[in-house]
Amino acid sequence: MVKKVLLINGPNLNLLGTREPEKYGTTSLKDIEQAAQNQATAKQDGSEVLVYQNNTEGFIIDRIHLAKQEGVGFIIINAGAYTHTSVGIRDALLGTAIPFIEVHITNVHQREPFRHQSYLSDKAVAVICGLGVYGYTASVEYALNY
């Protein structure tokens, strides 16, 4: 079982709770991160969830590289808009060979056509989208039992 999970959130996810609440809800990123960390703590087996958010592609790539050195066993990533554009993030995930779940709060397939393309989905262990913030809870549960 995985003991160390990295939860990565990309651009604009720092605005959760206030950004388009009709789409993304009113839960803040801080609340999502705290809930994920509490899930790990509740296992009482030394599991932990590290959290990271950045709006800059290169910093996200650097954080993925660092995860390998830290012994992270699983990544949960909501790459936001970079899902649809970033070969660099895809290559970083593949380069570390750390299994990952792609998560999105909204159902991207019910949105604009450009959001239907993901550079990550075909390499992800799973894709969770459209479950609201519960998608994070489900992802953490899966990752901690991987």
UniProtKB/Swiss-Prot annotation:
Site (Transition state stabilizer) found at: 19
Q: Which InterPro entries match?
A: DHquinase_II, DHquinase_II_CS, DHquinase_II_sf
Matching entries from Gene3D superfamilies are given as: Dehydroquinase, class II
**Which GO terms label this protein's molecular function in UniProt?**
3-dehydroquinate dehydratase activity
Question: Could you tell me which HAMAP family the record lists for this protein?
Answer: AroQ
Q: Which UniProt keywords apply?
A: Lyase, Quinate metabolism
Q: Which gene encodes it?
A: DQD1
Family assignment from sequence similarity: Belongs to the type-II 3-dehydroquinase family.
Query: What pathway is this protein said to act in by its record?
Result: Aromatic compound metabolism; 3,4-dihydroxybenzoate biosynthesis; 3,4-dihydroxybenzoate from 3-dehydroquinate: step 1/2
Q: Where along the chain is the active site annotated? A: 24 (proton acceptor), 104 (proton donor)
Query: What Enzyme Commission number does this protein have?
Result: 4.2.1.10
Q: Cite the NCBIfam families for this sequence.
A: aroQ (TIGR01088), PRK05395.1-1 (NF003804), PRK05395.1-2 (NF003805), PRK05395.1-3 (NF003806), PRK05395.1-4 (NF003807)
Q: Where does substrate bind?
A: 78, 84, 91, 105-106, 115
Name of the protein in question: Catabolic 3-dehydroquinase
